[in-house]
Amino acid sequence: MKIPITQSKEWQTLQNDLKETSFFEKNEIYQYLAILKKTPVGNYLFLPYGPVADTREAIQQAIRSVTELAKKHNCIFIRIEPQLDDCAKYLDKIAKKVKDISPIDTWILDLTPDEATLISNFTQGTRTCYHNVPKRGLAVETTKDQDGIKHLISLQNQIFKKKHLTGYDENYLKTELAQPFATLYLVKYHHPDTNPTNPEEQTTDPIPEDGQVIAASLFFDHDDTRYYMQSASDQRYRKLPATVALLTSAIFDAKRKGIKQFDFWGIAPEGADQTHPWYGFTKFKKSFGGSPKHYAGTYDIILKPLKYRLFEKSKQLKKFLH
């Protein structure tokens, strides 16, 4: 079984540190991590990208197990997201398809080729940006220092404020970074030693201060996979290849550690046009080479229909009020 990080024992440790109640079950044919979610209407269990199994029959056994667990804790429903490719038809019979919580489509880069081959698989634009990183005064650092989270939060707030969104709080991100599987990458700008003398090379674009962090991201490592998680860059300096510097460093560092694949963690669905909110960063992620991966999505197994309807109504009301 290939275990996603969100169904691992390490992820349960993160949940414990976040003061969440969770339940871990593992045997020879399936594995799951179920997180107890509390609402004013009642509780439910959430299995992010779980349960995990290699066959539909094993998925069925895992669902029976988690159903008993849910009943024991008086849950209204169970929210599951199995990654098994051929289980969607089965899930349609026993569960309700709901809005996806975890990304249903992602982009996977195979890290087993040599670095030269990986670079050759970049698009021309990304390859040019990669080679220009040192010339543009960009340097990438890694840290486990929780003080570094302030940079990620500051950069995320720029984006979230513009889009009227709410990001993760500081404690959540610091708790993530405290886990052994997490590393924070920072891209800093340093003024180049020489300034362009040719008028054509000079620019009126805004320039960061020396030593300023202009991009940051958390990366998680589990088994043979590195995951690209919370990330942000300073939108004032878009013409600097900060995100290319960030990702290429993370990709090649992972390869040197012996990690086999890089999960970009979410892209727009196949065929999405420019109106899709993920269109831009999907095109960017694909520019590093790789291949798509599609999952079944999020399903609710309803145990208490009346309370489940109340749960849905309460969500609709909350959305309306906000």
Describe the predicted segments one by one.
Residues 1-41, 84-87, 93-102, 108-109, ...:
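A conserved beta-strand-loop-helix scaffold within acyl/acetyltransferase catalytic domains
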Residues 57-105:
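Non-catalytic accessory segments adjacent to catalytic cores
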Residues 40-44, 79, 86-89, 270-272:
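Short catalytic/ligand-binding loop motif for oxyanion handling, primarily in non-cytosolic enzymes
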